[in-house]
Curated annotation (Swiss-Prot):
Transmembrane segments: none annotated. Pathway: Protein modification; protein ubiquitination. Keywords: Coiled coil, Ethylene signaling pathway, Repeat, TPR repeat, Ubl conjugation pathway. Signal peptide: none annotated. One of its GO terms (cellular component) is cytosol. Interacts with the C-terminal domain of ACS4, ACS5 and ACS9. GO terms for biological process: ethylene-activated signaling pathway; negative regulation of ethylene-activated signaling pathway; protein ubiquitination; regulation of ethylene biosynthetic process. This is ETO1-like protein 1.
Amino acid sequence: MRTFYPSDSCKESQLDSLNPQSWLQVERGKLSSSASSSAPLCRESFIKVPEPQILPHYKPLDYVEVLAQIHEELDTCPLQERSILYLLQYQVFRGLGETKLRRRSLQSAWQEATTVHEKVVFGSWLRYEKQGEEVITDLLSSCGKYSEEFVPLDIASYFPATTASSPEAASVKTNRSVSKNVVFKIGEEKIACQRRKIASLSAPFHAMLYGNFTESLLDEIDMSENHVSSSAMRVVRDFSVVGVLIGVSKNLLLEVLVFANKFCCERLKDACDRELASLISSMECAIELMDFALEENSPILASSCLQVFLYEMPDSLNDERVVEVLTRVNRSQVSTMAGKAPFSLYSCLSEVSMCIDPRSDRTLGFLEKLVDFAENDRQQVLGFHRLGCMRLLRKEYREAEEAFETAFNLGHVYSATGLARLGYIQGHRLWAYEKLSSVISSVSPPLGWMYQERSFYCEGDKKLEDLEKATELDPTLTYPYMYRAVTRMSKQNAKAALEEINRILGFKLALECLEIRFCLYLGMDDYEAALRDIQAALTLCPDYRMFDGKVAGRQLQTLVYEHVENWTTADCWMQLYEKWSNVDDIGSLSVIYQMLESDACKGVLYFRQSLLLLRLNCPEAAMRSLQLAREHASSDHERLVYEGWILYDTGHCEEGLQKAKESIGIKRSFEAYFLQAYALAESSLDPSSSSTVVSLLEDALKCPSDRLRKGQALNNLGSVYVDCEKLDLAADCYINALKVRHTRAHQGLARVHFLRNDKAAAYEEMTRLIEKAQNNASAYEKRSEYCDRELAKSDLEMVTRLDPLRVYPYRYRAAVLMDSRKEREAITELSRAIAFKADLHLLHLRAAFHEHIGDVTSALRDCRAALSVDPNHQEMLELHSRVNSHEP
């Protein structure tokens, strides 16, 4: 997917000024005369930057404070409120872009659910979130480990059975002489019943049969006008005697349920409710029964139908009948089907619907319900802000303004972006600028998104100043880099444009930034580089569409491919070896993508692709590649290796080891031994396991493999030897790895030099790595450990420029400031990074600094926020306990 919320300004036909065919109709890298004559004009309009997105997320000014509040409330609130607090925590992490953390919060909401409705909503939501992970469940089953997490629940078992009617109906007393039996006449048919049994069904029947009415003395009562069939009346009679419904058809149950409601027969209604719920066998059946359940106020049936709808997301939300039911229900009907979980329900539905189509009437309906069922300010903020984003997309500007205004007035300052954007659309550019200026001046410290948004309402140097400030405060924002790159390209400074976009691509592989760089390379006639970027983008997202979704990425890839030199299989392997050795991960991805289009050994290539994607911090794409490797494995023993990696990467280490052993049992192979060694080294706390790991890696090296993988095995073997203090053996491994151009072995060899007390040699070794590696932020960080403080500070400043998401440099600089008794400056240094990265170690260190200066309140806040990130971190728990004991 490109962007979730594309901008209106990008919806013009950008391809009117760009004909991809004309750009690519070239001979030997030269534009045709017609294309070249219009190139400057084309290129200026060709590369367009979409306006900054307004995200439909909860984005509090101080997420640390909010996480701390949630953590504190979780410690003190009643059990039934915990799920909704975890849902709020989920929304905070979603706004921060923390996928793993938000999913964990959703898991906690499900685990802490105290009602069946919460269990159904959160369980179904998790099932939706984990789409595509069914293979993991299957693999666990093959290892004898079963998961029953998200199977449909037996809804009826969570509802207490109705055991008796009112005392008046159950205890029948009368001084009047009446017969023991009564006959109900329906048309020409007569159904004989026991008067006492029928009377016990409800108070109305008791009054009818034993009350002070003339009819009460009758032995025969005509029920023909009560819209009940004789068959249904027989079911009522039988139930009055035996108390259960046996072998009753669905249609008859529906009729009996209506009858039970009419005559207030609670036990009978409950029995019908349960029986009907048990008969739901499909989506069609659930759709058919839901209207009836809501009309007749049947909670078990309604909840069971709802479970089917949620369990089948997202497909069920493409059914207009399902959507119609879920959006037209009134408050009472929502209570019938969702109990006390309506806000959770519509949070789930609106989020899934926004992923399908954020502009749809369905999304609007769900968001309006979300707002209706918000019970506090936080929930209202989320609902109104989302509603404002959706209204803005639909160009319903007045309604969008009302929603954003409400969210803003409730304290959601981020909603000011929506108000400013609306002001700009209506021609009030200065007002929009002043709105953001007011926000910036009222907040300390301001956040990056504030300057990014304000930049949209000014030009020239002012705009660039705001964008520089935005990057300084939040280097993860992509818009400033893209704008600066395109601006420099428009000034014919291609080198500066590439340097700018490479800044962010060095640490964040964002599709929109790859697209911009692709366009820059096209503008420079560098088709090989352009091809590399489009292939990398298609690796991340196979269905990626460029130019605001107007052109399929595959189409552009095909067009560019016609104008680069074709590589043979041997050429591809040489290119892969070269780029892998130079730690050029994006280049390696491109080569593998090209190789996969041939009939090469796809399993091996998809596996290599997954390794690269993990290095590039793209875990979801990496897992997709690993599953493709499994599907394309050429043998059972190869497939078992990929299954082992799938299990290991999803936290199932023992099962991963089991798969590796199964693979070795079929055939000894490099990858099976490597997997077994890797998993054992990473998971075992037993020091004696090192000898086993060494043996496994030695076995791996005896098996056939290519130099890329052998280099990795030698590098890993060297690491084990270092841990065992066998430095000579470790050095041999690293040197042998370098001989096959495993460039990262420089880092291991540097460690050996350092442990031999040769710090200068360690520094030089890391310098060699820096010179060779294209992605070298980690190398600068490691080199900083082998030099004096001033050089270390210089290296770590370089790390922050190359990859501002690496937290060690901030911690180091803060520690240096703390040593110099510059406590406030130290805390400010940590706060710089915490503003855009929810990191446990940063929060931990800042909490310790706050404790050191006696600021218990701030220390406790940071402890609680850190425990929201990792609830089981032992050192954090100890610090929290210590700080908590000092709280007044």
